[in-house]
A protein has these predicted regions:
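Bacterial Sec-dependent N-terminal signal peptides
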Residues: 1-23
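Short alpha-helical segments and helix-capping/turn motifs at coil-helix boundaries
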Residues: 27, 40-41, 118-119, 187-188, ...
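Short, solvent-exposed helix-helix connector turns and helix-capping sites enriched
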Residues: 50-51, 84, 146, 360, ...
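Short, ordered beta-strand-loop transition motifs
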Residues: 99-102, 106-109, 119, 189, ...
């Protein structure tokens, strides 16, 4: 047994020698509440000055821990899609899946260059630091048992820490559209340590931690590196929360994850509380009384719903649901009904502003999750079961007067004629100058799809592409001399769909009678 252990440790040492060696980070013991139940042995060994043994005891504690749960992954039923398996295998060769818009994925070199920027699209650089291939590598490891995935993950994790140091910069520079005069190490911080990306890692690393924890490559030294780095992430967000919008929501929800998943940190209660307080506040700041999210973008409206729901999920799993009041749930339900109303019969959404197109598969999955939260809502149940259970709303057309979304339909079925119009108030960054735009569904097809988001931001040609696709004249609305709308502050003055329908039907009936035509000839 001793010989086998020595061989394993030697193999790991040979592996890490190709990159940065793992180090024992003794400062981790000052970050943890060593009086937390289960850490008694860790505390005793640390007080005796035996930090290496304390780190081993800490790893034993985490491997045996069962009182903390996350709804994101079921370790008893780990599955991996063909696409995820490809990301995992490509990741071994440093070909990293970063962005669906840039395929095939780029290779970042044998000695990973975390600053490689092959196309000057900011998202390509930002999303590299979300490490989307890490969780698939963890799934591949758990399913196959092949240690190569765990070894490579540990190597890349340490490599990222060493090559992406956090240096101080002005908070507002994280959100600049173009890097301007910011260069070198500070420019890299702008991408690697933007709070949104940091929060993404906070959330995803809870799953990665669980997936790789049994591996011999997950050494006591690595554990201390991991925990110190994780702590640094949470502290960074706490000091650099975004001012508003979906970024703030994402960051808050993920701080709840951090505080709930690692309650052993001294600051964990403060992390969790900060996230809960922000979501409880922002759900009323960012969501209008009609259920519309104030960025007026269907994609980010959907994202906001799922952010609020994920917070409830981690709360339910760990026993703190009571920290979210009833009006929090009521607002989520109104947001879901808003989204259901503006969606088309095939479950897709209008691509207003920076929206992206959803798929039916994705949306049925969402409705199923939402139906568990709101089992009494028959409409949500209807969409979750594709009409097998539940019931459709008892109306056709619907106006969301504050958000400025208006839906006209004669049916909820695939044969419907449905028009969705956007004419809302002033919104935020993702809202394009597209007031008056519409999409028209007829008999199973979207005849007037809007352009949605082509690209967000970047340098040179990328920014030119962004600006071209944002133009008012590119949307399904009116303009003058191809100029952009200078303001998007529409106000609803009148919404009487039923009265209008009655008036139109009355005129049609009178005309039919005068011309002696059967009134049932048309509907």
């Amino acid at each position: 047994n001793k010989t086998l252990k020595y061989i394993i440790l030697l193999a790991i040492a040979c592996f890490v020698s190709k990159g940065y060696a793992q180090e024992l980070k003794s400062e981790v013991f000052s970050l943890l509440n060593l009086d937390y139940p289960g850490l008694e042995k860790v505390k005793a060994l640390h007080q005796e000055g035996k930090d290496e043994d304390a780190a081993k005891a800490l790893l034993d504690y985490y491997r045996a821990r069962t009182n903390v749960k996350t709804p994101d992954i079921n370790l008893n039923k780990v599955t991996i899609s063909k696409e995820e398996q490809q990301w995992a295998d490509d990741g071994l060769k440093h070909t990293f899946f970063v962005h669906k818009g840039y395929q095939p994925s780029y290779n970042y070199g044998e000695d990973i260059n975390w600053q490689y920027w092959p196309v000057k699209d900011n998202e390509l650089r930002w999303q590299l630091h979300r490490h989307k291939w890490f969780t698939p590598m963890g799934k591949a490891y758990r399913i196959s048992g092949d240690e190569k995935y765990a070894k490579e993950w540990a190597h890349q994790y340490i490599d990222w820490i060493k090559k992406n140091p956090l240096v101080k910069m002005d908070k507002k520079e994280y959100e600049l559209v173009s890097d301007g005069k910011i260069k070198g190490e500070v420019e890299n911080v702008r991408f690697a340590w933007r709070p949104l990306e940091v929060s993404n890692r906070l959330q995803d690393q809870t799953s990665q931690f669980q997936l790789f924890l049994p591996s011999p490559s997950f050494t006591p030294d690595f554990l201390t590196e991991f925990l110190v780095n994780y702590y640094k992430h949470a502290v960074h967000i706490l000091a650099n929360y975004s001012d508003q919008g979906n970024h703030l929501l994402f960051e808050a929800q993920r701080m709840i994850y951090a505080g709930a998943f690692f309650p052993e940190f001294k600051d964990a209660p403060a992390w969790r509380k900060s996230g809960i307080d922000i979501l409880n506040r922002e759900i009323h700041v960012q969501v209008y009384e009609d259920g519309g999210q104030f960025e007026l973008d269907p994609h980010y409206h959907l994202a906001a719903i799922n952010i609020f729901c994920k917070a409830l999920g981690i709360a339910d799993a760990n026993g703190f649901r009571k920290e979210f009041p009833q009006d929090y749930l009521d607002t989520i339900e109104s947001m879901i009904m808003f989204y259901a109303n503006i969606s088309f019969p095939d479950y897709t959404n209008p691509c207003f502003s920076d929206a992206k197109l959803t798929t039916k598969k994705e949306m049925v999955k969402n409705y199923k999750a939402w139906s568990k939260l709101f089992p009494k809502n028959q409409a949500i149940k209807y969409f979750a079961t594709e009409g097998k259970e539940g019931a459709l709303p008892d109306y056709m057309s619907k106006g969301f007067l504050k958000s400025g979304f208006f839906v006209f339909r004669n049916s909820w079925g695939m044969d419907a004629t449905q028009m969705v119009v956007k004419a809302g108030p002033k919104a935020f960054w993702h809202c394009q100058p597209d007031n008056g735009t519409f999409e028209l569904w007829f008999n199973g097809k979207n005849l007037f799809p809007d352009s949605g988001s082509y690209v967000y931001a970047g340098e040179g040609e990328v920014m030119e592409q962004r600006n071209w696709h944002r133009q008012t004249c590119v949307h399904n609305t009116v303009t003058l001399d191809n100029k952009n709308l200078e303001t998007t502050e529409s106000v609803t003055k009148l919404w009487q769909p039923w009265q209008v329908a009655v008036k139109v039907l009355s005129i049609f009936t009178i005309r039919c009678r005068k011309e002696k035509l059967p009134t049932a000839a048309k509907t």
